[in-house]
Each structure stands twice: as structure tokens, then as C-alpha cells.
Design a protein with these regions (language model features):
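Helix-loop-helix hairpin linking two adjacent transmembrane segments in secondary transporters
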Residues: 94, 122-177, 222, 226
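C-terminal transmembrane helical hairpin of 12-TM major facilitator-type secondary transporters
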Residues: 266-310
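Conserved MFS/SLC helix-loop-helix module at the cytosolic interface between two early adjacent transmembrane helices
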Residues: 54-93
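Cytoplasmic helix-loop-helix junction between adjacent transmembrane helices
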Residues: 98-136
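Intracellular juxtamembrane helix-capping segments at the cytosolic ends
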Residues: 109-121, 305-318
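Paired small-residue
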Residues: 78, 82-85, 93-102, 290-298
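Helix-breaking motifs and short loop linkers at transmembrane-helix boundaries and internal kinks
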Residues: 35, 67, 88-94, 232, ...
Length: 390
């Protein structure tokens, strides 16, 4: 299962995940170097996220006619150039432009990469293959971001982006060497692809993907103040908790892929139900570190166990437009990231406490579960390839 082509995709995934999140640990350094405030530097995070959302459909359309290996290499070239721009940017505006350029490669790479990963294995192993590719993203949170932050703080923030450039070059060479040629691009014209995506069976998993991400990031965005102000953990202790959550994300992602290959709908229903239960318990238990730590690890695992099942569902629901559908689903995840952060902020501004944010995440997860359960009422909305047997 862990083949060299999938490892090549995972290496690229690791680089993309590192460049997306490493900036968060370097905001004070960037702000001081470019003479902007820390909140202004923070826009480099949201600017990247919106670049993914906006760029995903544009790049998917632009690469629709390319063979998939060629498309992946073109996207890695954009990724490398964008990070070179970040490393060399003399001004805040140019750094923002380079971040957005880099983000344009993000959604399409994960989208096309997921299709390629699923095509490289037997049908009963597709979700596992996608989860292995996404393991690069989760490992970026566990290893890449802490290492990149430490490197940037020790050698200057630009050094972190030079390191990401090196990762991108290595991943690009691995794609050249190990991804097979001859993988087709689009199976039809753009009009046909958009018609396929305009049907509810293709839109439903994207709606659920967005809601799953909103649920996660309405809490994750504010996890540090929750741990410090509610649980009473020191700033140094928060770093350790985030590392443990990252391990939970990685394990949950891999386990979700394995379970989804057995029964996709049961994996999603169980994942959302477990997520709701954990978040409700976290609301009551968050004042003590003893229950909070295992609950947060479990929460991260359950949240990322949903990723590969939803990605497979989207690909199978839009067989006439797998690249575009898979890429747009990555845009849906990132739209959920931004929306979740905004929704959590709205709740806090309205008077909610950090302790109450898990309840907000549970509410959104319950809505996602309700949409998922509609497939039991109308099984036809789920592709026959992944529909449970009667």
C-alpha cells in the first residue's frame, strides 16, 4: 500500500502543509522584519486560505486538459516559485502576493493528487491511499511546522521558506521519478464537468466537507486561549498539547481511510457522532488537563478521520469531473476553515466564552451528521460504488 508514487504525493503534501501553517509561528518575526503589526502579518494566514478557495476552481479549469502527472508537476512548479517569492519578498505586499500564488497550487494539487492516489490502487484500498497522501499534511503539523518555526526563529523567518523550497524540489523530483505517465486528464469538456457538479449527489459531500471543517476550526482557531485561560496550561505546555493533537490527526486520518474502504457511510456517521459526543464532554471537562488532553487527541483523530471518506465520496459522485470535483472539495475544506474561524470569533464577540466553543463545534457537526443521514432516506444520492449493501 505504501508505494513510492504515494510517498511522492505525501512528500509534496508535507511541503504544502508546512508552508500553509509555519507562518503562524513566525508572525512576530515577519511583522518586525517588514515593519507591520502582528495582526497585519496575521492576514498572511487568511490570505493563503482565501487563495486556496479562489484558486481551486480556477486552477482546476486551467489544468483540466493536462495529463495528471503533467498537472501535478506544473502545480509543484507554482508551489516552488511561490515559496521562492516568500523567501525573497522585500515588502509585505510582495510577501502577500507570493503567499496567494503559492495557495493557488494547494487545492488543485490535493484534488488531483487524491484522484491519482485512488487510481494507483485497487478499488477496496482507495480511501487508504488518499489517507496516506494526506498523512503528509498531518505530519506537517507534527514535524514540519515546529521544525520550520524553530529554524525561522533561529536563522530568520526567510530560512523557513527556503527549507520549504527544498522540500518542494525533492517532492517534484519524486513525482517525476515515481508517478506513472499516461494518467488521463479531463474525460470531457468543461460544460460536461460543470453539469456533473451541479447535481445534488456531487454537491452533498462538498456541503458536508465544509461543515466538518467549520466544526473543527470554530474550536481549533482558538485552542491556545482555551488551553491557557480555561484549562490553565502554560504557553510551553500548549506546545506539547498541540503536538499530541497533531499525532491524533495523523492516526485518525490513517484509520479513517482504512475504515472507509470497508464501509464509507458507517465511518462518516460514526465519526460525526463521536465528534459530537467528544465536544460536548469537552465543554464540561475543559477546566482540568487530565480529561482535556485525551479528549483533544480523540477530537483531532475523529475530525481528520472524515477527510479521506469525504474525498472519495466526491470523486465517485462526479465520475465525469473527478479532478474538478476533488479540487473543489479542497476549496470546500478551506472555506470551512475560514468560516469556522469567523464563526468562533462571532460567538466570542457576542459574549460566548472559550469554554463554550466546543458546543458550537458540536452543533455544526450535528448539522453535518443530519446531511449525512439523508443518504439513508434517499440512498440514490450516494454513488453506487460506495453505497452500503441493502
Amino acid at each position: 500500500m505504501i508505494s513510492r508514487p504515494i510517498l511522492a504525493l505525501a512528500a509534496a503534501s508535507f511541503g504544502i502543509g508546512t508552508t500553509e501553517f509555519v507562518i503562524m509561528g513566525l508572525l512576530p518575526d515577519v511583522a518586525g522584519s517588514l515593519h507591520v503589526t502582528i495582526p497585519q502579518a496575521g492576514y498572511l494566514v487568511s490570505g493563503y486560505a482565501m487563495g486556496v478557495v479562489v484558486g481551486a476552481p480556477i486552477v482546476a479549469i486551467a489544468t483540466a486538459g493536462l495529463p495528471r502527472k503533467t498537472a501535478l508537476l506544473a502545480l509543484m512548479a507554482v508551489f516552488i516559485i511561490g515559496n521562492l517569492g516568500c523567501a525573497l519578498a522585500p515588502t509585505y505586499g510582495l510577501l502577500m502576493a507570493a503567499r496567494i500564488l503559492t495557495a493557488f497550487a494547494h487545492g488543485a494539487f490535493f484534488g488531483i493528487g487524491a484522484v491519482v492516489a485512488s487510481d494507483l490502487v485497487a478499488r477496496e484500498q482507495r480511501a487508504q491511499a488518499i489517507s496516506l497522501m494526506f498523512a503528509g499534511l498531518t505530519l506537517a503539523n507534527v514535524l514540519g511546522v515546529p521544525f520550520g518555526t524553530a529554524l525561522g526563529q533561529a536563522a530568520g523567518w526567510r530560512a523557513a521558506f527556503w527549507a520549504v523550497v527544498a522540500i518542494g524540489v525533492i517532492a517534484g523530483l519524486a513525482i517525476i521519478r515515481y508517478i506513472p505517465t499516461g494518467l488521463p486528464g479531463s474525460r470531457g469538456g468543461l460544460a460536461r464537468e460543470f453539469r456533473a457538479l451541479g447535481r445534488w449527489p456531487a454537491l452533498l459531500p462538498m456541503v458536508i466537507s465544509t461543515l466538518a471543517s467549520v466544526s473543527m476550526f470554530s474550536l481549533f482557531t482558538y485552542i491556545t486561549p482555551l488551553l491557557e485561560d480555561v484549562t490553565g496550561i502554560s504557553p510551553r505546555g500548549v506546545t506539547g498539547v498541540l503536538l499530541m493533537i497533531g499525532i491524533g490527526l495523523t492516526v485518525g486520518n490513517l484509520l479513517g481511510g482504512r475504515l472507509a474502504d470497508r464501509n464509507l457511510l458507517r465511518t462518516l456517521v460514526g465519526g460525526f457522532a463521536g465528534l459530537i459526543a467528544v465536544l460536548v464532554v469537552l465543554f464540561f471537562a475543559s477546566r482540568s488537563i487530565v480529561p482535556t488532553l485525551p479528549l483533544l487527541i480523540l477530537w483531532g483523530g475523529l475530525a481528520f478521520a472524515l477527510v479521506s471518506p469525504l474525498q472519495i465520496w466526491v470523486v465517485d459522485a462526479a465520475t465525469d469531473a473527478p479532478n474538478l470535483a476533488s479540487t473543489l472539495n479542497q476549496g470546500a475544506f478551506n472555506l470551512g476553515n475560514a468560516t469556522g474561524a469567523w464563526l468562533g470569533g462571532v460567538a466570542l464577540t457576542a459574549g460566548a466564552s472559550y469554554r463554550q466553543l466546543p458546543l458550537l463545534g458540536a452543533l455544526v457537526a450535528a448539522i453535518a451528521l443530519a446531511f449525512t443521514l439523508t443518504t439513508l432516506v434517499n440512498p440514490r444520492v450516494m454513488p453506487v460504488q460506495i453505497r452500503p449493501a441493502d
